[in-house]
């Protein structure tokens, strides 16, 4: 009662891993112990600012922004409204390439524009160097942080369930894109493969014709990435998705993920295609701490894979396209 003379404050959080988070890269809400009230805190300069800004750039929004009925403090609602002012910076298809592709500015430039807008009149250039210091990248650039450290730090912050994926061709100066998993349906994967990566490949071919140094290496790496992404699009085993609680006729055919099945199961083909860089990372810049080992507990006899797995909750299973297509046809013919 002494700490909360006005009663418990309404919910608030500056932690982007919480549903209650207001969504603003640098906004803060603090509890004033002298007055016993919530108030607007100072603009944040911590290790989460760049992570939130990248997520916003990729079009991600937090539950508190989308649910007007969520119980939230007025101070948090203030930042939800300020977050809405940043929506024009969000990429429409949830694909942001690190180099400039198709006339879009490179990711680092777009991210900087969003940061400047987030801090508003408080922005000074030393804020960027302080933010980079917070993410263990002192004296370096936003572009190299995106290429080298963003994804590893993103996986760590969000408990190894990344929702922004860093897809690359294995070259430090090659093709790389950040992709919003929540928007990565079949159509968007095709857009990544044939529109963005396709444009990059065309440019490398032109550079090769002009005998520009490094073009052959970049072209080979980009075409290698394109082939791997096509394997995921097609989804023949072992580049398939397997969902333990779905019967054979409801298993995804090719890249047609049900986002409700979660990152852990849907990310598998991106990690199982032949690796372009780090061991077992597939086409991702680093491998998240994700496994498909057997889950705890036993399945009920009515579970679709109970008999095959003898009640064990097996996730590391693969199915051919032929098996799945036949099962769908049989179910449709019933």
Predicted regions: what is each one?
Residues 4-6:
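Beta-strand-rich extracellular modules
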Residues 9-334:
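Terminal accessory regions of large proteins
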